[in-house]
Amino acid sequence: MTSTIALNYTPTIDGAASHYDDLDSFYREIWGEHVHHGMWLTGKETDTEAAENLVTLVAKLGGTGKGSDVCDVGCGYGATAKILAERYGANVTGMTISKMQWRYAQEHNDVPGKTT
């Protein structure tokens, strides 16, 4: 077994964006609209339900409510932003470096005045 370590590798924003864009369909197949792990409360939740459980916990811990301003850095496909806007009435700004994720979020998260 061999391994290689790139000692002179310098990550760039463009490189990271390309990574997410190149693996877009893979990420959506594996993660769905949530590009993060979840929280299984019973062990019987689907991956999506577990991801939404985690969003719910974070929203509660953060005191998210009607009129809250939230910046979702690394928003991926916008699923978390959509939940925070629809369920909690938050004003959410989502940020991603991936053009593919941004395009998907724009096409699938129609919450006027709440998500960008």
Listing of model-derived features with the role each one plays in the protein:
Residues 25, 56, 82:
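Active-site phosphate/pyrophosphate- and oxyanion-stabilizing loops and adjacent acidic/basic residues
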Residues 69-71, 80-116:
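Class I SAM-dependent methyltransferase SAM/SAH-binding core
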Residues 1-29:
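N-terminal auxiliary segments of SAM/dcSAM-dependent transferases
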Residues 18, 60-64, 84-86:
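Short, charge-rich binding segments
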Residues 20, 58, 98:
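Conserved hydrophobic/aromatic pocket- or pore-lining residues that grip, position, or stack substrates
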Residues 74:
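Conserved S-adenosyl-L-methionine
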